[in-house]
């Protein structure tokens, strides 16, 4: 292995984990706390913040009005540039001796106007009274700092070794699963600022935006994800607490049961895509169409599989309404009842990492991954027409919009946005459905989800044979 390969692996793994830990996890925590505050009619995550000088707080209205004025000025500039282009004026406006065209000026102003308006609109919400709270996002940061600085209490009769490693084991599957998730198309390093050809093989160095491309990619995810049951069982056993033991037993049986549905619900997708590689699944969805005009995303071909996999994944990471293993009204807190401070926070981090990884996997299999309708590797196109504006006024816009680096960044952003929305949807279920009893959870798995999964496999196989 050479230096650049190792560096690439480290950077790609850091990107996946960084997005999950530093973007998704805080957003999920903030969303969940805001939802709970709304339902319980309380303040919410706004107590944690940085105290700001009085002069800054008093000048927020003035800053907001300045933002509105700046947005209005940018909008007027965009309109002026558009009028000059329409009237066929000089292509070089000669503003401050800057070598830019009217088209470039229009692009900058058209992007800047709404950005400044939104910035002015949200400015007051960054503060709560005299504190900078960033929409309540700093509250979670302060909670994490507090958790790792408080005393770690260990039950006197607990198995100290198993008690200590259980939360670590809970985090390992989430870290390992990120290695096979493709988060973008291949990056051709010699074509970053050029437009890729629509067809053919492209020579030159390529950076695959995936740590490991395995021919058993999805099976690897099931194999590694299934080891999470070990941590719950160990935590329940080692805590020397009967409620924790009951929670561990519940978690183990529930996770093992729903893994069956998780696997069977995706068999139809394997048959459709004819591959187990996650990146090939995305390519199949991006290269085909559904009914001739819709993207060939898995949710259109396998809607039942999506519903089954979505709810089975919620049961797998034990979120409401499938949180019987940690039901507060029955067994207090389940397998991690005796955990506190940093170790308890590790359980929470592992749980939200599972939500993030599961959302990314659903986005890849059912929502085209990084695929964006109307965007191909050669740039923006629709109904056979390629986005290419003539004239030097629009040269910068056309070149920038179709550049390989722009296409790649938009694709990565689309994938991350899909996963984020799916994660928020799974958290929304918590505040929509009541908790099921443990027996109801098991009956739902074996009497409804499993038969429907088998039916989906049977119907998919017949349809593929008929239309192949």
Residue ranges and their predicted role:
Residues 1-468:
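Selective transmembrane helix interface/packing segments
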